[in-house]
């Protein structure tokens, strides 16, 4: 009788404890995270829903010596990730395929650097990247289908030293892209700067965008900006939701190519001086356009280029171009511009914070394959955050003054007229 009673009592004890081998030591995820928070004395903020989620082998995933390893072990099965805010505070977020940690960027740059040691091996890598980026983007299937009609223009509006004219250009499958041309009032050939905009307030209609393009035009450059896919007048055509699709990635690249096709035909454009400049998502587009189009002679991505962030919007990373040639990143894609002039603007408050120590030395190495280290530069603003503020704009002005010979005496943002959004639209 004793032999029967003892196993029965043991079974009751095991069942009461809830964790056992047969159940894979499973616990509710929320309970596990609460215990971890207390154990390591950290605050956890949840950007995910843990309701009903259960974690197998829960307590065995805890590493008493490392909060980082513990959180990674616990969250990975659910495609969640910890994002460190400080030593005592973590945000729990969904897995973000385009965003990694700064340490991951270092590892990726080191791996990429091991693939080429001279110009010849780099050129082979570059050819593979260019071919596979185009394939993954699917751009070559669409370009032959683009309309060849001339754009429709609004009347020219003249201001202090420059003019603005809006346009609407047909692209593919009945779609259009609308934007504005900021041009000097002086006659003759001028450099051209294509200016894809990012996700800053009001897009291309915002004050900062108008200040930059108007100032560059006053100094002697023809500048063009255009709506993001699903923003501005594009939203009237395809809806705002279209911006949050992979299609936006393709169409914004196609729009940039078609606008350049048309702009270099203008009599006032010097085709030997063709630049591209944008910030944030516009900086991501800047790099992509240089990969897709060899006609650019100068590039200036601002607060965008990184080895550990590909761009958080589908318009930047909706198509898997970072999988090209076995894996790449925006820093390597930017390096493909060598040996032509490039200036990268970075700051201490976003994913470009590592640029001086990681991405810029990498760019210098690639430019060194062409003995052109002097053609690549970095303006780093360690105390600034993610924006297109005056110091960043001044860096842009200086780059194009030096590279394209713009007239520095005309550098005065106060002379630019800020127009209302309706004035910048191509459609009535």
Q: What do these predicted regions represent?
A:
Residues 57, 64-67, 93-176, 345-428:
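Alpha/beta-hydrolase-fold serine-hydrolase catalytic core, especially in secreted/extracellular enzymes
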Residues 159, 174-177, 184-193, 199:
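Proline/glycine-enriched tight loop/beta-turn segments at coil->beta junctions
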Residues 188-268, 304-315:
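Cap/lid segment of the alpha/beta-hydrolase catalytic domain
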Residues 18-97:
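N-terminal export/assembly leaders
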Residues 296-335, 340, 347-360, 369-372:
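Mobile cap/lid helix-loop segments that gate and shape the active-site cleft of serine hydrolases
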Residues 268-280:
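Alpha/beta-hydrolase fold nucleophile elbow
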């Amino acid at each position: 009788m004793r032999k029967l009673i003892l196993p029965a009592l043991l079974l009751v004890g095991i069942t009461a404890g809830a964790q056992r081998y047969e159940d894979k030591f499973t616990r509710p995820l929320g309970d596990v995270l609460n215990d971890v928070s207390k154990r390591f004395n950290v605050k956890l903020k949840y950007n995910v829903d843990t309701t009903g989620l259960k974690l197998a082998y829960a307590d065995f995933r805890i590493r008493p010596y490392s909060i980082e390893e513990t959180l990674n072990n616990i969250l990975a099965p659910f495609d969640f990730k910890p994002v460190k805010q400080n030593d005592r505070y973590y945000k729990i977020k969904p897995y973000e395929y385009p965003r990694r940690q700064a340490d991951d960027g270092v590892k990726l740059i080191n791996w990429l650097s091991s693939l080429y040691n001279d110009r010849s091996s780099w050129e082979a890598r570059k050819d593979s990247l260019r071919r596979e980026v185009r394939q993954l983007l699917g751009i070559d299937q669409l370009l032959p289908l683009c309309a060849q009609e001339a754009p429709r223009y609004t009347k020219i509006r003249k201001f202090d030293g420059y003019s603005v004219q809006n346009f609407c250009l047909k692209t593919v499958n009945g779609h259009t892209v609308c934007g504005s041309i900021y041009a000097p009032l002086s006659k003759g050939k001028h450099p051209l700067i294509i200016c894809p905009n990012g996700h800053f307030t009001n897009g291309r209609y915002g004050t900062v965008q108008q200040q930059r393009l108007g100032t560059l035009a006053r100094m002697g450059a023809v500048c063009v900006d255009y709506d993001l896919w699903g923003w501005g007048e594009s939203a009237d055509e395809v809806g705002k939701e279209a911006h949050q699709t992979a299609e936006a990635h393709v169409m914004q690249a196609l729009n940039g190519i078609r606008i350049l096709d048309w702009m270099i035909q203008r009599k006032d454009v010097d085709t030997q001086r063709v630049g591209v400049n944008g910030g944030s998502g516009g900086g991501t587009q800047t790099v992509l356009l240089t990969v897709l189009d060899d006609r650019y002679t100068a590039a200036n991505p601002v607060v965008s280029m990184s080895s550990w962030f590909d761009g958080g919007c589908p318009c930047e990373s909706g198509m898997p171009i970072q999988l090209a040639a076995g894996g790449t990143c925006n820093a390597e894609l930017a390096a493909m511009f060598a040996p032509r002039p490039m200036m990268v603007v970075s700051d201490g408050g976003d994913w470009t914070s590592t640029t001086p120590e990681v991405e810029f030395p990498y760019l210098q190495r690639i430019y060194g394959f062409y003995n052109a280290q002097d053609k690549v530069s970095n303006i780093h603003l360690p105390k600034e955050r993610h924006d297109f503020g005056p110091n960043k704009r001044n860096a842009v002005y200086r780059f194009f003054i030096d590279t394209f010979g713009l007239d520095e005496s005309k550098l005065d943002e106060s002379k630019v007229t800020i127009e209302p959004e309706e004035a910048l639209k191509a459609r009535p």
